[in-house]
Amino acid sequence: MPVHHLLICDSHENTIIERFYLTPEERRKELSSNGNSSEIRAKYMKQWKERVISLTKPTWGDAYRGIYQVATVGDKFIVHISSGKLLFIITGSEDCDDFGLKEVLETIINVFKETCYGKKNVGKMLDEEIVKKSFGKLCVGLECIIDGGIVDNLNVEFIMLQTKLKDLSKFERDFKRKYKKNH
């Protein structure tokens, strides 16, 4: 599932975290341009962010009320929702449609909440300050979810183990035990 852009901001459009992901074709073009494309890329990223904000801003009120919002630009889907004081906006295409992107956002938000507040995070609100305190772990979590623009993992328990850099054998044992129990 290709993801192109992830933006986490507040209601004043202040960027907290932003990631752009290149498609394999874009990566090849950038490598073959001998570094001449960095200015073009920076301009594109700025324009895309402005476009995403202008397209989604009219529905931020609904997103802050917990209703997922969807927009499309050509073959790209843009899905956004808030959690606490933060707005999560993701763009994807192909098999990463609005339903797939909703699932990715749910995982990202759950990883953010669990990283910032632990497992007992019901009713706790995400904001810029709490995200800054756990910024490193959150970035590792995002890399576990979206690796090089491709959705790699949506299992929150596995992602949390990765952010702690612990041995995965415990996760594998627990997963096998739960799998046998359910089947």
Where are these regions (language model features)?
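Acidic, low-complexity cytosolic segments
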Residues: 1-183
